[in-house]
């Protein structure tokens, strides 16, 4: 109810300003051909009724790959991504994450396998090892790297964070982002009617 009430409040405020609202819940794996479970509400507002009438959200597209096809299991990442033997929690994660075919979701310290072939929703809280997307590669159990997280959000390969951004903050920014291809498709629909 909280999400709906928040949306209703925002909708009323925007409508009171003279805009026509269009919104739709869209999942990255359904609208971007990226295997990430990420459903978000996208809102488009028009000041012109005719433009609003001609706008339509993009149609779903088929998902053609599984998350683990996007991961190079034979490529070692920096040590910062790997769970060690140093703590009870790290040992628990290493013992739990056993299947190399899936990405696991660690949330509030508990690991759960996602057998749907998708990457779990990338969130701002994934900046900590207790809330992360985790997998087993040829070298051990680790979190998704920043680059892999950017890929699952649809960022172009040439995108890089400045060296001044801490890894913790970069994960937060990725988790707070919307998937780039979904926004691009919505923008293309807006451009089509303008």
Q: Could you describe each region identified by the protein language model?
A:
Residues 1-14:
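Single conserved hydrophobic/aromatic residue that forms the stacking wall/gate
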Residues 4, 28-33:
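Short histidine/acidic/glycine/proline-rich micro-motifs that form metal-
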Residues 19-30:
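Conserved S-adenosyl-L-methionine
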Residues 20, 34-194:
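S-adenosyl-L-methionine-dependent DNA methyltransferase catalytic core
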């Amino acid at each position: 109810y909280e999400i709906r009430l928040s949306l209703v409040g925002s909708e009323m405020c925007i409508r009171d300003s003279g805009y026509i609202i269009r919104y739709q819940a869209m999942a990255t794996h359904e609208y971007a051909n990226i295997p990430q479970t990420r459903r978000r509400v996208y809102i488009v507002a028009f000041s012109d009724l005719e433009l609003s009438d001609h706008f339509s959200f993009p149609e779903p597209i088929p998902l053609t790959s599984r998350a683990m096809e996007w991961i190079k299991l034979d490529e070692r990442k920096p040590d910062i991504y790997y769970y060690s033997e140093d703590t009870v929690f790290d040992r628990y994660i290493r013992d739990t994450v056993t299947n190399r075919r899936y990405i696991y979701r660690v949330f509030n310290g508990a690991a759960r396998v996602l057998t749907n072939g998708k990457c779990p929703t990338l969130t701002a809280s994934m900046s900590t090892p207790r809330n992360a997307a985790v997998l087993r590669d040829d070298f051990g159990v680790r979190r998704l790297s920043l680059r892999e997280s950017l890929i699952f959000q649809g960022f172009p390969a040439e995108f890089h964070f400045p060296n001044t951004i801490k890894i913790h903050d970069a994960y937060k920014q990725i988790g707070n982002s919307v998937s780039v291809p979904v926004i691009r498709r919505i923008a293309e629909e807006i451009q089509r009617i303008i």
